[in-house]
UniProtKB/Swiss-Prot annotation:
Source organism of the structure: Arabidopsis thaliana
Keywords: Cell membrane, Disulfide bond, Glycoprotein, GPI-anchor, Lipoprotein, Membrane, Signal
Name the record gives this protein: Early nodulin-like protein 21
Localization terms from the record: Cell membrane
Zinc as UniProt keyword: no
Lipid tethering residues (GPI-anchor amidated serine): 116
GO cellular component, one term: plasma membrane
Glycosylation site residues: 30, 71
Annotated family: Belongs to the early nodulin-like (ENODL) family.
Position of the signal peptide: 1-17
Tissue specificity: Mostly expressed in leaves and flowers, and, to a lower extent, in roots and stems, but barely in seedlings and seeds.
Domain of life of the native organism: Eukaryota
Length: 145
């Protein structure tokens, strides 16, 4: 039973997707933070979802060149629903800009680096390690009781 629990917890920790939530607004003029700062502090994997929340705005996925130029004329993806969910389906950089005139130039743009699910890094270890620790603790309680 212990081994089965370890396997189930490890598998569930490694294959589940995550939903990242973001308030998609024009950054304040005096802000030193950017959406790229936010994105670089997150770990995005294939299958993860990003939820953009905004009012009277839009979000576009664009090419690298369109991102650099804040060009919204040919988006790969466009939404203006106020609550947009976007799923990452490839391990590539994704480029997002606001489709509202002038917003991208004011910093409402972001690059998201997405890695594959089988990509291993040191930050992937804690969920599995936590599952093993939890199972060990549970097993210890079983033998003590």
């Amino acid at each position: 039973m212990f081994l089965w629990l370890v396997i189930v917890l490890t598998i569930s920790a490694s294959v589940s997707s995550y939903e990242h939530k973001l308030n998609w607004v024009v950054p304040p003029a005096n802000s030193s933070e950017s959406f790229n700062d936010w994105a670089s502090n997150k770990r995005f994997q294939v299958g993860d979802i990003i939820q953009f929340k905004y009012k009277k705005d839009s979000v576009m996925q664009v090419t690298k060149e369109s991102y650099k130029q804040c060009n919204s004329s040919h988006p790969r993806f466009y939404s203006n629903t106020g609550k947009t969910r976007f799923m990452f389906d490839h391990s590539v950089p994704y480029y997002f800009i606001s489709g509202t005139s002038g917003h991208c130039e004011k910093g409402q743009k972001m690059i998201v680096e997405v890695i594959s699910r089988d990509h291993t890094t040191t930050s992937a270890a804690p969920p599995a390690a936590f599952a093993v620790l939890l199972c060990f603790f549970s097993l210890s309680l079983y033998f003590v009781a």
